[in-house]
Design a protein with these regions (language model features):
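N-terminal leader/targeting and pre-domain segments
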Residues: 2-60, 101, 123
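Conserved beta-strand elements of beta-rich interaction domains across eukaryotes
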Residues: 14, 66-69, 108-111
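Thioredoxin-like thiol-disulfide oxidoreductase module
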Residues: 45-49, 74-123
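Eukaryote-specific detector of the first structured module of a protein
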Residues: 55, 60-61, 67-78
Length: 123
């Protein structure tokens, strides 16, 4: 049973190392392709780290949320359609990506480690 957390940690480490090797422009191109398919970007711990790693020459606006009913965040569920509307409207208006701004969502179920990290630094 201890093997699974070790495997998850190793996978995250390898993904982080790969993300660090990508240049800012390569990361921009990668996330730009994804954003054209769906905006806001649906992130997880690995993609969040890649998207927000420095240096970068683009901006990110990310909502950390908890949509699952077991977390009891009604505000999260109420805000979701508004955030999606903002992200989609921005994407339609900035087709050439001149603003170099990405919108994203990181849900607790997909980004537990990121939430814990943010909570530690903020609290």
């Amino acid at each position: 049973m201890r093997f699974l957390p070790l495997l998850a940690s190793a996978s995250a480490l390898v993904a982080s190392a790969f993300a660090a090797e990508q240049s800012t422009e390569e990361r921009f191109i990668k996330f730009n392709r994804l954003a054209r398919l769906s905006s806001p970007l649906q992130l997880n711990d690995v993609s969040y780290k890649s998207l927000t790693s420095t240096p970068r020459d683009y901006s990110v606006a990310i909502v950390l949320t908890a949509h699952d009913a077991r977390f009891g965040c009604q505000l999260c569920r109420d805000f979701k359609p508004e955030w999606e509307l903002i992200a989609q409207s921005w994407a339609r208006g900035d087709k050439q990506q001149e603003s170099r701004l990405f919108f994203g969502v990181l849900d607790f179920t997909e980004g537990r480690e990121t939430f814990l990290s943010v909570w530690k630094t903020a609290g």
